[in-house]
């Protein structure tokens, strides 16, 4: 089946198998920030933006992205690097495996609500799993970033 997908601003036309998952499509195109974790839509590691909304790419067929814009962390380098520095500064990068999903979802939250409360942050990021940091570093990084951005 032929699909037309805009990936990180680049228009692509690809022949794909009907059962190809979006996570496999973006990884095949070299977007390795998108991680395979639980494969049941429970961990947030595979988060990408579809038309600027966060979706879990492990549970969406690539065919559903036909005609849509998909953005991965690679497509948000400037924005992600700025924010990622605050995550790292707060010790949330023990292994770093979960960071792309956290960063994608945090950026989605900031777009939806530029000044979220701590409780709203916790609620929004509840679907992101981290196996080693206990979430406090990510939360501190987000709060530090928001304070910096507000005073910028």
Give residue spans per PLM region.
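Signature of N-terminal electron-transfer/Fe-S-associated modules in redox systems
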Residues: 1-152
């Amino acid at each position: 089946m032929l699909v037309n997908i805009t990936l990180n601003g680049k228009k692509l036309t690809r022949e794909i198998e009907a059962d190809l998952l979006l996570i496999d499509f973006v990884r095949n195109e070299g977007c390795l920030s998108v991680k395979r974790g639980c494969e049941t839509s429970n961990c947030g590691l595979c988060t990408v933006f579809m038309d600027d909304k966060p979706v879990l790419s492990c549970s969406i067929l690539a065919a559903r992205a036909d005609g849509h814009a998909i953005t991965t962390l690679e497509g948000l380098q400037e924005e992600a690097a700025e924010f990622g520095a605050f995550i790292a500064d707060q010790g949330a990068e023990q292994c770093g495996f979960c960071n792309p999903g956290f960063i994608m979802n945090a950026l989605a939250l900031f777009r939806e609500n530029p000044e979220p409360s701590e409780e709203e942050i916790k609620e929004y990021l509840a679907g992101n799993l981290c196996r080693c940091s206990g979430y406090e570093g990510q939360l501190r990084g987000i709060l530090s970033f928001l304070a910096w951005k507000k005073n910028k």
